Amino acid sequence: MGDIVFVSAALYLANSPNWKSKVLKPGFSPIPSNELYNFEQTLKSTSQEPVSSTAVSKAPEKSALDAEDGGLRLDYKGPKYQELRLFLPISLTQQLHTLVIQNIPESATKTADFIQWLEQATTKHFSTKTDGTKVEDLVENWSSVIASTLESTQDIFIRMYPLTEFAQVVLYWIEWFSKATDSVTTVHIDENTARYIDDIVPSSYTPDVTEEELVALRTQIADLKSSVSESSTENAAMVAYEVDMSTLSDLPKSSLNQLVKDIIEFRTRVLTMEREKRTQEALEEGRRRRSQLKRVMEQIRKSKGSSVPATEPEEDEDEYEDEDGEEDWAIERRRLEKEKESAQQSYNALLSHLNGTVMPDLRARKQRLILLKDYEAKLQRERAFFLKELLHLGNSDYYDHRREFKEEEEQQDDVDRRAQNEQRIQAPKDAVLQASASASRSPDTSAAHSAPVQEPVAKEQKIKLALKRVFDTRAQEAESDSEPEADIPATAVSASTPAPTADLPDRLPFQGPELAARMAELRQSRLVDELVNEYLGVYEDELVDYILDNIVENASRGQLLLELQETFDDDSVRIVDAIWAKLLKH
């Protein structure tokens, strides 16, 4: 707690000696001890009251304070000046009575004089008022900020007292500055202040600015511009530079003022030297560029074969400068023409986009909106056409899966496979028919005692779902077929269904490498693919892989027959016999 000091701003402003303490007291605020000096300076700047009738009696006290400070605080901006962070309005009244004068010439020493003159001139203009408006009662506080370092301009923020003539004064200033400077220097107010002025200004008031007042304002602004001299620049730099007093808190207060002045003078001297150095560098750069331009001009003259000597008089140089000006004007004309052409191209592109994309899309959206508004009526009106279209599409030939040209498509598929270098070895149909005729209709008794299928459940469910879709499709086709089929004699059915063979063994007599070789030959012959495609109606590669994996794992005819009965019913006997005949064939 040794670095903390408790202070009271109210007691300091009341000139009480007990305004600071090392212990906490009611109404005191803690601050670091190294910020105590800044706190005092801030309170000193804010404690300056406007000059009133008691200003004469307070003048000796002010002189004594200035003498005690040792000239540290340069009162060049007057008692009404505040730093920008202290100038910020803290109430609605202060906000409504705050305005800014923009683009005023920046002068570190004469800005306060300009504010004082502005008060006097305004009071003189409104001297006919009966309430006796005084100069001191017009401006409460003011502050400034640099607007442009290149143009040396500043913005002056002014907070006025809540006078009854506030609206008239603001409107008078706006008209005055606008006419005197051709709207270069303007008075700006925010939206809330503008509304407030509109509410309180008399309806019959019109700002009246005389020519004498315009000339006086122009003279004051010109005086601000001409005040930028070497001495004023150095003085402004000295005042603008602020010393961080927190780093000097350990020094005695008696030597602090002189040390601050020495620091500011040293800083000002360094800035002046740096400014002179930059000015000298700019001059040297200008000389170098001029010499370079002269060399370029000499090379141009030599390239054109001119006989004009290098040391030509000034009149000739002026002529060349005029010619260069004409060439520059031609370049500028070409640049303007290019910009105009580019703008025309952009306009044409936008116009084509409007006519080709935006407008057609807009018209289409309008038509669609009209149709959507009458959607229900349109459905009722065109219901017969929709039903006719549905009936036509429902009886289309593309829904008939039992087409007569199925064999032609299979032949075309074979041609396509051969064109794509896919070898397709088709087993002789007579061998398949012979194996099917010798197949036995009675299932083997050993099939009931065979081991359960070891395939994963997920794969079986996937195959069964695919087969279920096929069967559902077949059922729908059977229901949609409205033509009655002719009765087929039982003898024809029995003749077309070959009898199963009973001499085929239940288990394959070979295993290991020989079984792998027979399975590779069976897979290459694509017999299983053709059987599945023939009896199922569609080709299912997963079902083919499932049949081949079952043969490799179980090598049992009864087990395979049991697995295929659910899918192919009675056709499973023919499929299994054909596969077993192919495997047992030498």
UniProtKB/Swiss-Prot annotation:
Gene Ontology CC: one annotated term: U2-type prespliceosome
InterPro entries the record matches: PWI_dom
Organism domain of life: Eukaryota
GO molecular function: RNA binding
Composition skew (Acidic residues), residue ranges: 312-328
Coiled-coil segments on the chain, per record: 274-356
Cell compartment(s), UniProt: Cytoplasm; Nucleus
Keywords noted in UniProt: Coiled coil, Cytoplasm, mRNA processing, mRNA splicing, Nucleus, Ribonucleoprotein, RNA-binding, Spliceosome
Gene3D superfamilies assigned: PWI domain
Keyword Amino-acid biosynthesis: no
Biased composition (Basic and acidic residues): 276-287
Biased composition, class Polar residues, residue ranges: 435-448
Region feature (Disordered): 276-328, 406-455, 474-506
GO BP: any one term: mRNA splicing, via spliceosome
Positions with biased composition (Low complexity): 489-502
A Pfam match: SNU71_RBD
Family classification: Belongs to the SNU71 family.
Subunit text: Component of the U1 snRNP particle, a subcomplex of the spliceosome.
Protein task: Component of the U1 snRNP particle, which recognizes and binds the 5'-splice site of pre-mRNA. Together with other non-snRNP factors, U1 snRNP forms the spliceosomal commitment complex, that targets pre-mRNA to the splicing pathway.
Protein's name according to its UniProt entry: U1 small nuclear ribonucleoprotein component SNU71
Organism: Eremothecium gossypii (strain ATCC 10895 / CBS 109.51 / FGSC 9923 / NRRL Y-1056) (Yeast)
Gene responsible for this protein: SNU71
